[in-house]
Each structure stands twice: as C-alpha cells, then as structure tokens.
Amino acid sequence: MGMLNEFKAFAVKGNVVDMAVGIIIGAAFGKIVSSFVGDVIMPPLGLLIGGVDFSDLAITLKAAEGDVPAVVLAYGKFIQTVIDFVIVAFAIFMGVKAINKLKREEAVAPTTPPVPSAEETLLTEIRDLLKTQNQNRLP
C-alpha cells in the first residue's frame, strides 16, 4: 500500500499536474502551428516563388522499382518543419519574456516603509537633540 500512496502523492502534486496540462496544451498548440504553416503560410509563399508546393519538393536519389518505394530527400517537408519550429520557438520566447517581465515587476515593486510609531518618532527626536547638544559642548 505504501507505494500506491507515494504514487498518488506524486501524481497529485501541483508540479506534475501543471506539467501534464502544459504538455497537452503544447501538443494542441503544435498542431495549430503546423496547420498555420502548412495551410496559411506555405501556399502563398509557394505561389510567390512560382506556384511551388513545398511539401512536394524532393530530390529522388533512387527511382521506385516494383514494390520497392523510391528513395527521396523530402527537403520541402523539412523546410515546413523548420518554419513550424521557428514559429513555436518564437511563441515560447515571447511567453517566457512576458513571464520574466511580470516577475521583474513583482520583484521591483517598491514596498513603502512602515510609518514609524509615535514612540519611534519621539525616540528619534530625542536622539537628534542629544546629538545637537553633544556637538555644541565640544570645543
């Protein structure tokens, strides 16, 4: 029973749950970015370059023979994947930058010093008076 309780305590910890939510949202975000790149960015880019469909760009190293498929370098798909990565990396960078900015603002937020009590004010005045009297007595 001890191992089951340990696992339950581990799985319910906030960090594990937060990580799981982050992974799920990250996977969904990755699909959105892939669709954005493949369906929105690449078609106009291909049109500008001369009607090229990037996903079809490839170099055939060996032609297909019978049941053996062709050996190709699909560099068009690689270009799409690189663009996917750049967009995801930029989005993560912007998110981290925003979080860091919020953390800095929290840390920099000045705290107002507490108002001294009447007793502290009186003691400060007495100290200042004693300093003044001692300075006047010195030759």
Swiss-Prot record:
UniProt keyword Transmembrane helix present: yes
Transmembrane intervals: 9-29, 79-99
Record flagged with keyword 4Fe-4S: no
InterPro entries attached to this UniProt entry: Mechanosensitive_channel_CS, MS_channel, MSC/AndL, MscL_channel
Gene3D superfamilies associated with the record: Large-conductance mechanosensitive channel, MscL, domain 1
GO cellular component, one term: plasma membrane
Annotated membrane topology: Multi-pass membrane protein
Keywords in alphabetical order: Cell inner membrane, Cell membrane, Ion channel, Ion transport, Membrane, Transmembrane, Transmembrane helix, Transport
Database matches in SUPFAM superfamilies: Gated mechanosensitive channel
UniProt subcellular location: Cell inner membrane
PROSITE patterns reported for this sequence: MSCL (PS01327)
MF-aspect GO terms: mechanosensitive monoatomic ion channel activity
Matches recorded under Pfam families: MscL (PF01741)
Functional note: Channel that opens in response to stretch forces in the membrane lipid bilayer. May participate in the regulation of osmotic pressure changes within the cell.
Family: Belongs to the MscL family.
Assembly description: Homopentamer.
The name this protein goes by in its record: Large-conductance mechanosensitive channel
